[in-house]
Amino acid sequence: MLVCDYIVEQIDGDYAHLRRVDLPDEELKLVARALLPAEIVEGCKLHSELMKYTII
């Protein structure tokens, strides 16, 4: 089970580009906004656990 934190780097239409906090040099993860909290903005932090994202 992967548990990690992300920073929302960019919101692009129906998708958000996320950067892992613990691996900042890794490629950005593209996630459908439908899977993310509606309140996200660029620069906010997300916690991911069991494919559920929450704002931290």
Regions found by a protein language model. Name each.
Residues 1-12:
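Structural detector for short beta-strands of small beta-barrel domains
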Residues 12-13, 50:
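Residue-level signal for tight coil/turn positions that link beta-strands
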Residues 14-19:
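Short aromatic-glycine-enriched beta-strand elements
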Residues 26-37:
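Beta-strand/loop nucleic-acid-binding surfaces
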Residues 35-48:
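Short nucleic-acid-contacting surface segments enriched for D/E, G, S/T with interspersed K/R
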Residues 50-56:
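Short, Lys/Arg- and Gly-enriched loop/turn segments at beta-strand edges
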